[in-house]
Regions:
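A short, terminal or domain-edge coil/loop segment
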Residues: 80-87, 154-155, 227-238
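Short, surface-exposed, polar/charged, turn-prone segments marking secondary-structure boundaries
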Residues: 98-101, 113, 160-162, 168-173, ...
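Acyl-donor binding region in acyl/amide transferases
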Residues: 1-18, 103-106, 113-116, 127-199
Length: 238
């Protein structure tokens, strides 16, 4: 299911993020299943309660590792510099993604319905990483992180997650939404990395957010598959 918009008020984005929706191009969408080559998987939307977020040794170590880099936050405008960096990133990844940043965010157009910002990470003058996020009134949604593969030892994707969380903390926002994880598909588990203890997971049936735990996700995945199987049986009987 998706929603098309012309301009998005901040409180509108807050509401729909809280209902398990997310940005795709210039629309909002939600889903409970993800079909992949290896099978059908359940999706589980996440958010971090900013006020409860704390860092452990791994997160603090990453801040120290990258402290020589400069960081700036700007309103998003698509530039050749961003596209060049995204192209380098795109060539280095082993999963499906949009071939350009403009295609991913603007779907080939120029109008943006979202209040979008970008975090830049530079080594001197060189842009080495960038993280795009949308702002609501009380929350942000992380849309994409991309980085120079030459700096892979600096874990810049995870670093950008921490920087987005710190941006939300600086502006006293309630939530940072990093997207969904996929049950039994560890490639998405990095979204828990910033602070599992502050992470909540969405339950579409009750429209509730609960503290994250793998036990809860396992039960929710089993329930979703059971409901899907029952629905398929009903359709076959008709």
């Amino acid at each position: 299911m998706s929603i098309a918009l012309s301009r998005l008020p901040g409180d509108f984005l807050d509401y729909y993020l809280g209902q398990g929706y997310y940005r795709m191009g210039q629309n909002l969408f939600t889903c409970q299943f993800l079909p992949l080559d290896t099978g059908l998987y359940t999706t589980h939307w996440l958010r971090l309660a900013v006020a409860r977020a704390t860092y452990g040794p791994k997160q603090r170590r990453l801040f120290r590792l990258n402290e020589r880099f400069t960081v700036a936050t700007r309103p998003f405008q698509l530039t050749p510099e961003y596209e060049v960096l995204y192209a380098r990133y795109y060539q280095s990844i082993d999963f499906d993604a949009n071939p350009s940043l403009g295609d991913l965010l603007l779907e080939g157009g120029t109008h943006n319905v979202f209040d979008t910002h970008i975090l830049e990470v530079r080594d001197g003058e060189r842009l080495i990483a960038a993280g795009v996020f949308d702002s609501g009134t009380n929350s942000i949604a992380g849309i994409v992180n991309f980085y120079d593969p030459d700096y892979h030892k600096h874990s810049l994707g995870k670093y950008l997650m921490l920087l987005k969380l710190e941006h939300a903390r600086r502006y006293e926002l309630d939530y940072y939404y990093p997207g969904y994880l996929v049950h039994n598909y560890p490639k998405f588990d990095y979204k828990l990395w910033a602070c599992p203890a502050a992470t909540e997971v969405f339950y579409a049936r009750t429209h509730q957010w609960r503290p994250f735990s793998w036990d809860e996700v396992n039960r929710e995945a089993a329930r979703l598959f059971a409901e899907r199987a029952a629905h398929d049986l009903e359709e076959e009987a008709e």
